[in-house]
């Protein structure tokens, strides 16, 4: 795997790590230069709106975290080194355990991302959050269920 591919994959994994730690501002900061698609027919949003959305929707438990593990798998990373651009398609599975909820998968879907390299560093340029494929018991994770 090239150095660029490792750096991009680490952005995918860092997102999951921050979200699972309950660090929503840190998670949103990964997208400070990105446009984010959260609705099939709506406009894209920026990092500030993403933080507002997650802050309103994601339940935090007494420990300050959502008590989840976002497992990012199967990243297919395509890089144009000369243009300083890349795309990635990956799967996610969200596991959760909480008081009253045994450890189980609660959601699965896909991320389609675009990246740009600026001053030698890769960063998110775009994320599509609309590719939500399967839902389990989301009562302990979200304050409201996702559409679709």
Predicted regions and their residues:
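A solvent-exposed, acidic/Ser-Thr-rich amphipathic alpha-helical stretch
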Residues: 24-92
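A beta-strand edge to alpha-helix "cap/lid" segment located at domain peripheries
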Residues: 63-148
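Short, low-complexity N-terminal intrinsically disordered segments enriched in polar/charged residues
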Residues: 1-30
């Amino acid at each position: 795997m090239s150095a660029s591919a490792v750096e991009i994959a680490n952005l995918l994994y860092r997102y999951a790590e921050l979200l699972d730690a309950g660090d929503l501002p840190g998670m949103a900061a990964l997208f400070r230069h990105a446009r984010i698609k959260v609705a099939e027919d709506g406009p894209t949003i920026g990092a500030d709106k993403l933080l507002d959305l997650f802050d309103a929707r994601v339940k935090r438990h007494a420990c300050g975290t959502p008590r989840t593990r976002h497992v990012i798998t199967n990243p297919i990373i395509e890089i144009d080194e000369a243009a300083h651009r890349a795309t990635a398609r990956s799967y996610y599975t969200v596991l959760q355990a909480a008081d009253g909820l045994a450890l189980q998968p609660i959601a699965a879907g896909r991320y389609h991302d675009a990246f740009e390299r600026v001053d030698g560093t890769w960063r998110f340029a775009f994320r599509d959050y609309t590719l939500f494929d399967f839902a389990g018991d989301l009562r302990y994770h979200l304050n409201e269920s996702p559409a679709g």
